[in-house]
Amino acid sequence: MSQPPTAPPVTQEIPLQCEDELGRPLTFVSSFGYDPGDPYAVWLTFHIPGGDVHWAMARSLLATGIDEPAGEGDICLWPNLDSDGRAVVSMDFHSPEGRLVVEARTRDVYQFLARTWAVVPPGAEADNVDLDELVDELLAG
């Protein structure tokens, strides 16, 4: 199966707000990434003092979380307002190591998603998946 050439990845630095263990406001930068070769996923890399932490989530989950509550289990998102009344997307991440609840400005998240949609429109993700290569990888184990 011949695939069209893959567009370059999309990345964007987005500031995230949360509270530290003492309830003080904390802002740090996260890298949001999208690779058209893995068209269903977005990657978040939290740049924190203890080292980078990577999370993957469905691009559709991130898009849904802008307008309505979405997700269950490890990642939940919902629209919210920050303390200044600005639209944000709240994101709740759970892992065996702990929990992190952050807020990102909705406009930043939407800008990132719009850039990914320009590369691979919603609904066209399957056009960017090489099924033959995927089967070969699965069989190679």
Locate the predicted segments by residue.
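Short, internal acidic amphipathic alpha-helical interface segments
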Residues: D52-P96
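Generic recognition of long tandem-repeat/solenoid scaffolds
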Residues: L44, V89-F93, V102
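Mixed-charge, glycine-accented linear interaction segment located at domain edges/termini
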Residues: H94-G141
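Charge-rich, low-complexity N-terminal segments
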Residues: M1-A41
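Short, well-structured hydrophobic secondary-structure segments
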Residues: P25-A70
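Generic detection of short hydrophobic beta-strand segments and adjacent strand-loop junctions
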Residues: Q12-L16, W55-A56, V102
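Residues that cap or initiate secondary-structure elements
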Residues: L22, P36, G50-D52, S83, ...
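A structural detector for beta-sheet-dominated domains
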Residues: Q17-E19, T45-H47, W78-N80, H94
